[in-house]
């Protein structure tokens, strides 16, 4: 089910399926900034990567001494979230473990996702709670896909990623599909930048990551969109890993613990 929020500048629509943004538009432009989930290319739009980013080639991970078949990027990509409430400037959603998630990931958890609008920007905050006796172990990442080109009269190669700091030469990475022949996923560990701008010089998406993200990645399946992905950690850093709890960068919550992380993006 779609829930909508708007202010004087933008309109945001969020789907309870996967808690993904279905649409994000400015009121003064006829531009859709978010990818539409066309399954001919990629059926997701901006999934939550939890409790792991990526997965082993055989999709088997060991949790607490037992092997479990897992989905790529975890249990939230196809999950149905529960809508909790709408305020004047926010939407709040919730997801809890269930029988299906427990078969892949044998831990109990609760997650809240809050979308807040400020002018032409949406801030998205994620809170993960451990309300049980057993400790909770997980990784985390985000995978938002933005239309590229934003202007249908332009092409993918008219766009670039501008970095706040010198994470790439000259702080600018020109986009072209050949880049993703060389790097199927373009990954930067420990980026100095907290701000990343997708732009053709006219229209833009400006992403700002808050504290806690340690990796920034770019991905496209040579499609009319680009994913700007902030991650806490990834299993790709440890090829062949089986023991999930030993993965680098995992977060551990004990009873009563809470993990909180957020990012935001503006549309121009």
Regions found by a protein language model. Give the residues of each.
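Short, Gly/Pro- and small/polar-rich lid/capping loops
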Residues: 1-8
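Short, well-ordered beta-strand segments enriched in hydrophobic/aromatic residues
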Residues: 9-14, 113-115, 122-130
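Acidic-aromatic substrate-binding/catalytic surfaces of carbohydrate-active enzymes
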Residues: 11-67, 227
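Short Pro-Gly-centered flexible turn/kink motifs
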Residues: 14, 61-65, 69, 251-267
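Extended, loop-rich substrate-binding clefts of extracytoplasmic carbohydrate-active enzymes
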Residues: 66-118
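Acidic/His-leaning functional-site neighborhoods
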Residues: 68, 73, 78-84, 178-249
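Beta-strand-rich interaction surfaces with strong enrichment in secreted/lumenal proteins
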Residues: 112-114, 248-253
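Active-site/ligand-binding surface loops and adjacent short beta/alpha elements
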Residues: 135-137, 145-212
């Amino acid at each position: 089910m779609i829930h909508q929020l708007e202010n004087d500048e933008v309109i945001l629509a969020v789907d309870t399926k996967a808690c993904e943004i279905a649409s994000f538009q400015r009121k003064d432009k006829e531009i859709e900034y978010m990818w539409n989930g066309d399954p001919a290319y990629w059926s997701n739009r901006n999934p939550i990567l939890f409790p792991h980013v990526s997965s082993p080639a055989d999709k088997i991970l060991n949790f607490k001494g037992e092997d479990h078949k897992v989905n790529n990027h975890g249990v939230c990509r196809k999950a149905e979230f529960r809508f909790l409430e709408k305020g004047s400037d926010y939407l709040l959603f919730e997801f809890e473990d269930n029988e299906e998630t427990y078969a892949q990931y044998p831990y109990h958890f609760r997650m809240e996702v809050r979308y807040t609008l400020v002018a032409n920007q949406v801030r998205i905050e994620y809170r993960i709670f451990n309300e049980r006796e057993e400790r909770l172990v997980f990784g985390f990442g985000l995978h938002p896909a933005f239309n590229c080109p934003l202007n249908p009269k332009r092409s993918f190669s008219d766009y670039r990623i501008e970095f706040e700091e010198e994470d790439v030469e000259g702080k600018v990475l020109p986009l072209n599909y050949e880049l993703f022949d060389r790097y199927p996923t373009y990954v930067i560990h420990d980026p100095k930048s907290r701000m990343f701008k997708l732009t053709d010089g006219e229209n833009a998406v400006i992403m700002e990551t808050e504290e806690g993200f340690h990796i920034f990645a770019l991905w496209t399946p040579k499609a009319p969109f680009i994913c700007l992905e902030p991650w806490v950690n990834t299993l790709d850093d440890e090829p062949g890993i089986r023991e999930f709890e030993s993965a680098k960068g995992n977060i551990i919550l004990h009873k009563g613990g809470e993990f909180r992380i957020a990012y935001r993006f503006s549309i121009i």
